[in-house]
Amino acid sequence: MAKHIPVRTMADVKGPLVLFLIGMRINTFWRVWEWLPAFLAMPTMIVELYKNPELGFLSARTEMAGRTITVIQYWKSFEALEAYASMSDRKHRPAWTAFYKRATSGTGAVGIFHETYIVRPGEVETLYADMPADFGLGGAVGMKPVTPKTETARERKG
């Protein structure tokens, strides 16, 4: 993990980008053969994305809470995310096809979800204090110091 930045900073959002949440919820632990492939597929996709910046992926972080695993991803655009999702020569499409075949079995052993948000300059507010330089939206697009003109959330949003 990156060294923490000991001053207050904010994300330096210069253009539109995408926040993509994707994850899974293990509904039936003992049906390991149904949820384990989905669990194991995600890290290989993330490695592929970091190795190929031309795909438009910026960064990701994984969070676990109980039975739910969520990967928070930042992308340059919705079009880049959509293009990657449909590329048959990349890791996502084959993994999705295999998962979908298992998911239609109707056991409900694993649930999946994703949410996509378009983030535009002037419509997002961030604040980081004593956080690692690679954390969150600021880690994806870069950070800049909070100044007297950006003290409040409203000022940072503008």
Question: Predicted regions span which residues?
Answer:
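Short S/T/G/P-rich N-terminal loop/turn motif that feeds into the first structured element of a domain
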Residues: M1-T68, A80-A83, T107-G158
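An amphipathic, aromatic/His-enriched active-site/gating alpha helix that lines ligand/cofactor pockets
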Residues: F78-G111
